[in-house]
């Protein structure tokens, strides 16, 4: 193969990620031409509604997947947290890159951390998972929907529309935005459990042997283990992007895996959570086993109520 086309969204972060992967692929495959095919997705076009109201994060993938299936691209680079657990026929999750910081981060021009926020401070997030957990920590805060790409969200913060906003730490790091806002507070895993796959890039590809050979060098073993656990947990719960679920698996220095999971109602009034240390052995099934424990505690019913809450909002 002489040329590989990457389907990508046109946002600043998406282009950074795709160009980052392009550079690695060209370094690993001398002589390979790599080109970007920039596509505007439904999620990019609809900016005036909450994601949970219009179909969730999958709206950022649909057109990219169609481009691959129609032969207009061979791979797409995604923030793995945005990739549903079920792939369309003909496409596979071919590689998962080394993980950046998996945590969420609180950004503010005035307040250094969550505790410093005054009563009735306005916090912006489009994520039901973040909304649930911040409301559990601080029920006195006002949570408002925040859409747009990273620079749009930061502009809204700087213009005073919000006292603080919550973003993925990885995106801030990738775009070198640590100095763009006065306070950037990485939220600990104890305070807020991230989304499945957060911090890693997922390389979705056509199921073609030559393409898979080219992208194989992007694969990170630990990221695959961690995110397989996280994605299988969400898959077992049948939890799409429109329900509040957080799950994080981290391979520790001694080879064991630390796992945290949380789910509940968007207002934070009812939540199920658990954390445990386990071995890497049989990691493909760990997420499903933990999900089964959550289901025994009433997780499915709680998620159904969460969906109903959002539909009636």
Swiss-Prot record:
Keyword Transferase assigned: yes
Biological process according to GO: protoporphyrinogen IX biosynthetic process
UniProt KW keywords: Porphyrin biosynthesis, Transferase
Enzyme Commission code(s) on record: 2.5.1.61
The protein's required cofactors: dipyrromethane
A GO molecular-function annotation: hydroxymethylbilane synthase activity
Disulphide bond pairs: none
Modified residue annotations for S-(dipyrrolylmethanemethyl)cysteine: 241
Keyword Ligase: no
Principal EC category: transferase
Pfam families named among the record's database cross-references: Porphobil_deam, Porphobil_deamC
Catalytic activity entry: 4 porphobilinogen + H2O = hydroxymethylbilane + 4 NH4(+)
GO cellular component: cytoplasm
Cofactor note: Binds 1 dipyrromethane group covalently.
Pathway assigned in UniProt: Porphyrin-containing compound metabolism; protoporphyrin-IX biosynthesis; coproporphyrinogen-III from 5-aminolevulinate: step 2/4
Similarity-based family: Belongs to the HMBS family.
Note: The porphobilinogen subunits are added to the dipyrromethane group.
Function: Tetrapolymerization of the monopyrrole PBG into the hydroxymethylbilane pre-uroporphyrinogen in several discrete steps.
Subunit note: Monomer.
PANTHER family: PORPHOBILINOGEN DEAMINASE
Protein name as annotated: Porphobilinogen deaminase
């Amino acid at each position: 193969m002489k040329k590989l086309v990457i389907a990508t969204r046109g946002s600043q972060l998406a282009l950074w990620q795709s160009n980052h992967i392009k550079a690695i692929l060209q370094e690993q495959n001398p002589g390979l031409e790599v080109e970007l095919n920039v596509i505007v997705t439904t999620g990019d076009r609809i900016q005036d509604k909450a994601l949970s109201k219009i179909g969730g994060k999958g709206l950022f993938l649909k057109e990219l997947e169609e481009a691959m299936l129609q032969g207009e691209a061979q791979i797409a680079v995604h923030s793995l947290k945005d990739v549903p657990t079920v792939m369309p026929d003909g496409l596979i999750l071919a590689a998962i890159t080394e993980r950046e910081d998996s945590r969420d981060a609180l950004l503010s021009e005035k307040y250094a951390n969550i505790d410093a926020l005054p009563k009735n401070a306005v916090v912006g997030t489009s994520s039901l998972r973040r909304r649930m957990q911040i409301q559990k920590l601080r029920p006195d805060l006002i949570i408002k929907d925040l859409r747009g790409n990273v620079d749009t969200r930061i502009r809204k913060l700087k213009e005073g529309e919000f006292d603080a906003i919550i973003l993925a730490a990885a995106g801030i790091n990738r775009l070198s935005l640590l100095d763009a806002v006065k306070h950037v507070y990485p939220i600990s895993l104890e305070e807020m459990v991230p989304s499945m796959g957060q911090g890693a890039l997922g390389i979705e590809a056509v199921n073609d042997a030559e393409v898979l050979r080219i992208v194989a060098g992007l694969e990170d073993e630990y990221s695959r283990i961690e995110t397989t656990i996280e994605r299988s947990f969400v898959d077992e719960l049948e939890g799409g992007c429109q329900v509040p679920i957080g799950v994080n698996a981290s391979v520790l220095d001694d080879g064991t895996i630390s796992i945290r999971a949380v789910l509940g109602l968007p207002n934070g009034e009812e939540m199920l959570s658990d954390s445990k240390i386990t071995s890497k052995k049989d990691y493909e099934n760990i997420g499903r086993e933990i999900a089964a424990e959550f289901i025994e505690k009433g997780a499915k019913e709680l998620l159904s109520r969460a969906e109903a809450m959002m539909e009636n909002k």
